[in-house]
């Protein structure tokens, strides 16, 4: 299948600037500086691939909804969809508010209907990195 649209959302304007003008300047990507949980939730309805390589900076994925404004949680609005999520056990970094100790603890943060297809742990000097790839 062909990729129809890529949207990158980050609260850090420096990250968006670097991605837009240095890393992916030759790609057709929509870059948005903002909180993915506030204004941009409607993006979920057309998304079929979620990539979050910084889950340690956010609430657990199963807590991304439902919100008062939406009757259904995000994962029931997008099925079928795939995901690639990463987190780590680097608890000593101040901005890491949601680190996990184990891959199982990370899996427990997924919505109930998530099916993990690939999981991986990579040791790092600062703490283990965890990767989950699957479908909703």
Short names for language-model regions:
Residues 3, 47, 78-81:
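Short, well-ordered alpha-helix to beta-strand connector turns
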Residues 9, 53, 84-86:
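Generic beta-sheet signal
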Residues 4-10:
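Conserved SAM-binding motif I beta-strand of class I
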Residues 7, 30-32, 117:
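General small-molecule cofactor/ligand-binding pocket signal
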Residues 11-49:
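S-adenosyl-L-methionine
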Residues 60-135:
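C-terminal substrate-binding/active-site "lid" region of AdoMet-derived donor-dependent transferases
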Residues 37, 45-63, 89:
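A short SAM/SAH-binding and catalytic strip from SAM-dependent methyltransferases
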């Amino acid at each position: 299948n062909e990729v129809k649209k890529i949207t990158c959302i980050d609260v850090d304007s420096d990250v968006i600037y670097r991605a837009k003008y240095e890393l992916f300047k030759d790609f057709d990507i929509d870059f948005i500086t903002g909180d993915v949980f506030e204004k941009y939730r409607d993006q979920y309805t057309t998304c079929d691939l979620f990539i979050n390589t910084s889950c340690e900076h956010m609430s657990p994925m199963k807590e991304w909804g439902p919100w008062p404004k939406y009757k259904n949680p995000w994962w029931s609005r997008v099925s079928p969809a795939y995901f690639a999520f990463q987190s780590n056990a680097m608890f000593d970094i101040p901005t890491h508010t949601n680190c996990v100790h184990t891959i199982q603890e990370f899996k427990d943060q997924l919505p109930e209907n998530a099916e993990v297809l690939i999981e991986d742990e990579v040791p790092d000097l600062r703490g283990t990195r965890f990767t989950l790839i699957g479908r909703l």
